[in-house]
Structures are given as C-alpha cells and as structure tokens.
C-alpha cells in the first residue's frame, strides 16, 4: 500500500521503534507445558535415550517468564555450574486440547512464537555436588527468568507448514 509507512509515522503519540520495550506475549498463563528430550541427539547430550511412547515433559512457572532483551539471571547455587539456552518453537493453545482427534490438532492452536528455554544443565547431568537425574528436568528449567517468551505471535494461517519450520539460537 503506497504511502502506508508515511501515514504510520505521522500518527500522533507514536513511540519510535528504538524506544519500544517488548514484553512476553502473556504474563500469567494458566499453564506452561514443555516437551523435553524429544530430539534423539539432544537426549544423548545428557546421557539418555529419547523417550518412546509419551515424551519427557515439564512445567514452567510464571516467574520464569521474561521478554526479549530482558536479563537472564543465572542461579547462584554451587550446584549450578553450566546454564544452557535452546531456541524453541512455542505453540500457543487457544483452548483445552484434551481428547482432540489427531487429525484436528491444529484446531486448538492460536499461534506460534519464539522461545528461549534455559536449562541448568549441570544439575541435570550431574556434577561434584549432585548426581544427575532426568527427573530433575522441571527443577533445572524453573529458575526465575529461564523462559523468554515472544514477542511476536504468528497465527496458523501465516505458516503454510509448521513442520517445515527450522528454529535455531545464535549467540550474539
């Protein structure tokens, strides 16, 4: 649309892009549910095989939520020796999705977003202070600020084939 950018820039009270502070898409979600060890190669990283049947899973607490460019606070525990970050595709559910037929899975999705999921990996794998255990998955993912969520919400109609998306993290 011709002239669109100029019209947008002339809106009174418009905040300049460089002054915009992005926040997480949602501050108090009912549930944050994560799937873990779903990549065979990553499961090997922590000395496990990828689960068969149901995937490994964990919950995130609301105090883990931060927006992009917010600081990630590293745990100050002596057991916490290696914090890692993984870029993930976040799937935002718009309704309860229990007992949804497999062929209708997309009907429960409102959209997708980017996530940076932090893990205190040394506790999960084990170190001089604590033996490793995959049951620690929820603990090692729930330190405050360990879940950067958003800021964009991409609706399903904007993604021709979600299974063809690639997600990667790049350290700046």
Q: What is each stretch, according to the model?
A:
Residues 1-56, 157-160, 168:
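N-terminal non-catalytic cap/leader segment that marks the start of a structured domain
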Residues 49-68, 85:
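Structural signature of FAD isoalloxazine-binding scaffolds in flavoprotein oxidoreductases
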């Amino acid at each position: 649309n011709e002239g669109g950018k100029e019209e947008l820039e002339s809106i009174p009270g418009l905040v300049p892009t460089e002054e915009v502070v992005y926040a997480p898409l949602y501050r108090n979600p009912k549930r944050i549910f994560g799937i873990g060890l779903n990549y065979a190669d990553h499961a090997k990283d922590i000395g496990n095989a990828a689960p068969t049947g149901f995937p490994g899973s964990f919950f995130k607490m609301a105090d883990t939520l931060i927006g992009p460019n917010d600081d990630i606070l590293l745990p100050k525990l002596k057991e916490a020796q290696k914090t890692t970050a993984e870029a993930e595709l976040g799937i935002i559910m718009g309704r309860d999705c229990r007992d949804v037929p497999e062929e209708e899975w997309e009907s429960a999705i409102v959209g997708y977003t980017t996530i940076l999921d932090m893990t205190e990996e040394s506790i999960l794998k084990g170190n001089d202070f604590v033996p490793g255990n995959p049951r620690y998955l929820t603990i090692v993912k729930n330190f405050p600020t360990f879940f950067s969520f958003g800021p964009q919400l991409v609706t399903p109609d904007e993604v021709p084939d979600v299974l063809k998306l690639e997600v990667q993290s790049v350290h700046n």
